[in-house]
Amino acid sequence: MAYIEGNTGKWEYVIGLEIHAQISSKSKLFSGSSTIFAANPNSQVSYVDAAMPGMLPVLNKHCVHQAIKTGLGLKAKINKYSVFDRKNYFYADLPQGYQISQFYYPIVQNGTMEIPTSTGDLKTIRINRLHLEQDAGKSMHDQSPHYSFIDLNRAGIGLMEIVTEPDISSPEEAAEFVKKLRNLLRYIGSCDGDMEKGSMRCDANISVRRSGEPLGTRCEIKNINSIRNIIKAIEFEAKRQVDLLESGEEIIQETRLFNADSGETRTMRLKEEALDYRYFPDPDLLPLVISDELINELKANLPELPDQKIEKYTKEFSLSKYDAEVIVADESVAEYFEKAANECNPKMLTNWLTSELFGQLNKASIGINECKITPSNFAKLVKLIENDTISGKIAKTVFEIMFETGKAPDKIVEEKGLVQVSDNNVLNTVIDEVIAENPESVEGYRSGKDKLFGFFVGQVMKKTGGKANPTLVNQLLKEKLSS
């Protein structure tokens, strides 16, 4: 467990998260308007989104399915009966004067997610609920010195709000939870998890306490927009609360905003309670009733999820848990890996994938889907190394050409004449030449200067243009030098 070091001793973090995940859907939660990102302002607004009188909401079935699939991925209970409620408050970018949400009877409850801790153990984070709700529009205050503008393109877009219990005990655990949840949503296809575009936003409820004491007064930090800022915001807010408590002041329950530039939180408003929103069932929407048949159908069609892939990679491919997690962290990488792993040694493939390929992708600032090397060609390269057709050193040269051109490795090896020299007679001839040309070094090695062995290996590799089989060179050199 992580602690905050105060002037009067240690304090514990108590953290709960609320994740707002924009549902991957071509249309909004209660209207047919498009959800394309960065469209011209107010170009994707229906009469329903603009709350014109007499316009009634119609529930998007696809959004419901996405929420159910996400609930299944979170090992949660899917409620067969749920209700939409009106959450009443006034914002300029909320034309209805209320938000349609689910307060009393959410669609999903009682889920769990396991995250790795700093000790290497797994920790279970309980998920209180997942409910459906509609997003608000966007207020823009920097377009004119005299006016604020409203863009309603986002108004009515479907959101899944995923709420954890206060089980998170450090900023790093909070970051791990969000990373793992984002990856799960991407595998399921229910949210793209792009925090920069705002399609996944995080609110953190933070309090501090002495070990063994009751929960303290919490403050909510709104709209944290990156993994890094989750850590920074929690660290700052927890330290702020500790400083107040140690100076004899009380924590005021409030909503605060995190400033990424200053790394500080500031007061936004006093924290509201449920009564302030006057929740009541939306009279324009019938209760949502979900059948066992639908749940079973969606469950049967779920893709293989990250934890399942990690288990498969460690058991079937004998990868370390760390390597499996690195590959599974990106669905595109996992898909690429599986296609290649069916044709070559998975462990050797992993080494090349996580070192050489990741390095080149980062250098070129591209994703694996933009890589010119096909999974099949990558597997061929690994097999050429496995079969001693080329050395690891030559393989790096071949790999660089493949990355630039997309050519098959066997073609490159053939064109460049890079086949590894593994003929004993040829290598013995080269070794004899090296020994004859360096009598003083031979005498030094035989008198106990073992480090000179590397010199002889280097000379053989130089004479063969780096194409000599290094394992065979080592074996033959030892025989020659010890005779």
Curated annotation (Swiss-Prot):
The keyword Nucleotide-binding applies. GO terms for biological process: glutaminyl-tRNAGln biosynthesis via transamidation; translation. It catalyses: L-glutamyl-tRNA(Gln) + L-glutamine + ATP + H2O = L-glutaminyl-tRNA(Gln) + L-glutamate + ADP + phosphate + H(+); L-aspartyl-tRNA(Asn) + L-glutamine + ATP + H2O = L-asparaginyl-tRNA(Asn) + L-glutamate + ADP + phosphate + 2 H(+). InterPro entries: Asn/Gln-tRNA_amidoTrfase_suB/E (IPR017959), Asn/Gln-tRNA_Trfase_suB/E_cat (IPR006075), Asn/Gln_amidotransferase (IPR018027), Asn/Gln_tRNA_amidoTrase-B-like (IPR003789), GatB (IPR004413), GatB_C_1 (IPR042114), GatB_Yqey_C_2 (IPR023168), Gln-tRNA_amidoTrfase_suB_CS (IPR017958). Gene3D superfamilies: 1.10.10.410, GatB domain, N-terminal subdomain (1.10.150.380). Its EC number is 6.3.5.-. GO terms for molecular function: asparaginyl-tRNA synthase (glutamine-hydrolyzing) activity; ATP binding; glutaminyl-tRNA synthase (glutamine-hydrolyzing) activity. Keywords: ATP-binding, Ligase, Nucleotide-binding, Protein biosynthesis. SMART domains: GatB_Yqey. It comes from the Bacteria. Belongs to the GatB/GatE family. GatB subfamily. Allows the formation of correctly charged Asn-tRNA(Asn) or Gln-tRNA(Gln) through the transamidation of misacylated Asp-tRNA(Asn) or Glu-tRNA(Gln) in organisms which lack either or both of asparaginyl-tRNA or glutaminyl-tRNA synthetases. The reaction takes place in the presence of glutamine and ATP through an activated phospho-Asp-tRNA(Asn) or phospho-Glu-tRNA(Gln). Heterotrimer of A, B and C subunits. PANTHER family: GLUTAMYL-TRNA GLN AMIDOTRANSFERASE SUBUNIT B MITOCHONDRIAL AND PROKARYOTIC PET112-RELATED, GLUTAMYL-TRNA(GLN) AMIDOTRANSFERASE SUBUNIT B, MITOCHONDRIAL. This is Aspartyl/glutamyl-tRNA(Asn/Gln) amidotransferase subunit B. The gene is gatB.
